[in-house]
Amino acid sequence: MHSRLNSRAWRGAMVAAAIATGAALAVAGRAVAQQQNFDNVEIDTVKVRDNVYMLVGAGGNTTVFTGSDGIMVVDTQFAPLSTKILSAIRAISDGPIRYIVNTHVHGDHIGGNESISKAGHFRAGGNVVGDLGAAATATAAIIAHENVLKRLSADPPAGQPQVPFAAWPTETYITKKREFLFNGEAVQIIHEPDAHTDGDSLVFFRKADVLATGDLFTTVMYPFIDAANGGTIDGYINALNAIMDITVASNVNEGGTMVIPGHGRLSDEQDVTEYRNMATIVRDRIKEYVKRGMTLEQVKAKKPTLDFDPRYGSDSGIWTTSMFVETIYKQMVAANPPTKPTQSKNQPKSSGK
């Protein structure tokens, strides 16, 4: 894809993606949002295809899907940007916001859940009436994998704020895929386990042929493997392969399935292919070094990411190239522990003297 938005937006997205690591990531967006100034952040709107749009601000990219049934929002960025996000949505459509889908647990993707859900309302079935029906339809439904709810409902790390109950998913799924009809289009929400986190979802709009990936694919950094929240490099590569199974190229050129990344520019299958190849090559290099018995320092000295650093590397911030390499190294060591040398049958035993 040659389509580009301004570099300010992408730099802001990259910073937002690297807010925190470990267990604190689920609530970090809220804590950092209290310290950052979002007054100067602008929300850029990109029409992707048909009635699907991408909103770019200071957190993860937001997807907006509109139609006769209402509006579906995929990821909600940071809480302080909620008013701006809502204004951008209203510039697209004044229809009711029915659904929010969270691709994973991180604060730069769920921060606006509470405000945006309260601005919408869910259309419940006819068997939900009275006070219960009113409660059930008072806000937009928030959909995510069950593991997202488990992470959000757990006690937060010491010193971190609890994500408000109103921002938690109201509907979860535990199967590989959840699919339903909305705005006359089949929408598929697909779980990719143990990848960026343990609760990642892809959201595929079949008729429009648009896929929102969350942080299972970005264009601005190395894969963010949140090991503390269940992420693994092998699962991440599996997820990229799953994305490629869904997407279709247009005559091996630009076009075909449009891919909305968690951070970065609008993409297509070729972009995902390049990213998958990079992740696989780096993983395999480090795996080979581990098999040779190299230490972490020796692996870093080999610079296994050297040819990809100009595009994805970073020496500063929370998610650096060094941290990417170290995370893969630790997971490869855990998967391939060194074996104790076996004693030859013909080797004489020590007399102990």
Protein language model regions, located:
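Bacterial N-terminal signal peptides that target proteins for export
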Residues: 2-18
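Divalent metal-coordination and catalytic microenvironments
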Residues: 51, 65, 75, 89, ...
